[in-house]
Amino acid sequence: ADGSLTSLDQQMITGEQWEALSDEEAYERAKDIRVMSRARPTDKQRLVAMLQKRGEVVAVTGDGTNDAPALHYAHVGLSLGSGTSVAKEASDMTLLDDSFKSIANAVMWGRSLYRNLQRFLFFQLVVNVAALLLVLGGSVIGTEMPLTVTQILWVNLIMDTFAALALASLPPSHEVMNEKPRKASDFIINKSIGFGILFCGIVFFLVMFALLVYCERRGKGGVDVHELTMFFTTFVMIQFWNLFNAKALMSHHTAFRHFLKDRGMILVLVLVLVGPVSYTQLTL
């Protein structure tokens, strides 16, 4: 019971008590404070500054003139639509409906967009790692470039562009709200994503390199044009797997969940399927 009271006392403080603390004491106490009563504008601003000093990302809501300093110094200042003009000018955005649910929805959309960017980077870097290794592998076995410059440009400019639009437009998911907050200094490609990029890129390379070696040893004259065309088509078709991997990245659901509702994803899959056929007809 005594421990609970002590913990509760640490979570509550008055404006006068907060002002009486030294900077060192305020720095240590800031992480435990949950309620501050009779707080003046300078007290709120100091609390924001101490939390920022501890590396926290601080958002402040307020509707009065006395909230303006804290709204201005916070990373994200959120004024209420019914608040004063001073509070609105000091804030970064205004909640027109005065609802905390709008803040939660904004966080959900932001986290979902961040995850979609991670998905696109995963997709594109896997393609680039596999293509780079294939070009190097082709030079090792003494064959001509298995992927031509035109083919690489097609993959990067056409397929990657539409894949970016499809992955970036995936609808937000409530499951991102269960994630822990990230530090502002965290790199967008974390260790697990980096490992997945290398693993999938190497697997794609091994599959395609085995096909390249087979075509090289199959004929006496090396790899002919038709085999290179088949090689490129196979490389593009493997990106089906890559795209589904990217869609399911860091998700607890299968990539086929709500598949028919993802029109952008369907468009990319059609493009991946039809594109190589059209390219082959033009080159032949």
Question: Language-model segments: which ranges?
Answer:
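Conserved cytosolic catalytic loops of P-type ATPases
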Residues: 67
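Basic, alpha-helical nucleic-acid-binding regions used in initiation and control of genome expression
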Residues: 71
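C-terminal membrane-solvent junction of multi-pass transporters and transport-like membrane proteins
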Residues: 192-193, 252-273
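Membrane-embedded transport module
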Residues: 2-60, 74, 78-253
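Conserved small/polar residues in nucleotide/adenosyl-binding loops
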Residues: 279-284
